[in-house]
Regions:
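Short proline/glycine- and basic residue-enriched helix-capping loop/turn segments at helix->loop/beta transitions
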Residues: 167
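Extracytoplasmic/periplasmic cell wall- or extracellular glycan-interacting regions that localize
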Residues: 1-98, 103, 108-111, 117-119, ...
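A residue-level detector for short acidic-glycine micro-motifs
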Residues: 63, 87, 103, 129-132, ...
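A structural signal for short beta-strand/turn segments enriched in small hydrophobics and glycine
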Residues: 93, 99-101, 138-150
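Short histidine-centered loop motifs in beta-beta connectors
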Residues: 104, 120-140, 144
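Short hydrophobic beta/alpha edge segments that flank linear recognition/processing sites
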Residues: 85, 114-116, 142-155
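A beta-hairpin/wing motif
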Residues: 157-164
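Hydrophobic alpha-helix feature that most strongly marks membrane-spanning transmembrane helices
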Residues: 106, 135, 146-155, 178
Length: 178
């Protein structure tokens, strides 16, 4: 039973919890929005297909959202939770919309590589493989504001992974970028 509970937790399939104010069987929202957050969420939603590319300068999408087959390796596939965007030396990640920096993490396996997460009401944008950060947790950011430099990856390419979520639901970023 403990193993089963742990698997449900990892897979995000735990049943919703209840409180005294909540009737049994009524799921709690993942994020409680203030009036300002609701307005921001609505504004973010209305910009679907028109958000700026989250990288400065020329770019190339090198890996798309969803299942991707690895070139040269038969039957090997990777599930990409975002898009991988290659830029040039000194290119920067930039905020795709107004929001608040909700978290900053150092990548556990790549020293000096950071992940920046920005909350836009119910929506979250995440920017992976950054260095020389220009923002701090809790800071408000504006659309197109620089977040940090994109770090060279192990191949020497300046590649950033960009992800979008609505609460816990993963979204295809290519459907949101204009």
């Amino acid at each position: 039973a403990a193993q089963e509970a742990e698997m449900r937790k990892k897979n995000g399939s735990d049943p919703p919890t209840t409180t005294k104010e909540q009737k049994a069987g009524t799921p709690m929202p993942a994020y409680r929005e203030s009036a300002a957050d609701k307005k921001l969420s609505g504004s973010f939603q209305s910009n679907k297909g028109h958000l700026p590319v989250p990288i400065t300068g020329p770019y190339l999408i090198t890996s798309h959202y969803g299942i991707n087959y690895v070139e040269g390796l038969k039957n090997v596939k990777i599930n990409n939770h975002g898009v991988d965007i290659r830029g040039h030396m000194n290119c920067q990640a930039r905020a795709v919309f107004d929001g608040t920096v909700s978290a900053i993490f150092e990548h556990p396996q790549i020293q000096g590589s950071y992940i920046v997460m920005i909350r836009h009401g119910q929506y979250i944008s995440a920017y992976f493989n950054l260095s020389e950060l220009k923002v701090k947790k809790g800071e408000k950011v504006k659309i197109n504001e620089p977040l940090g430099l994109i770090k060279a990856d192990m191949s020497g390419n300046y590649t950033m992974q960009f992800q979008l979520r609505r609460d816990r639901e993963r979204l295809n970023p290519e459907q949101w970028i204009g």
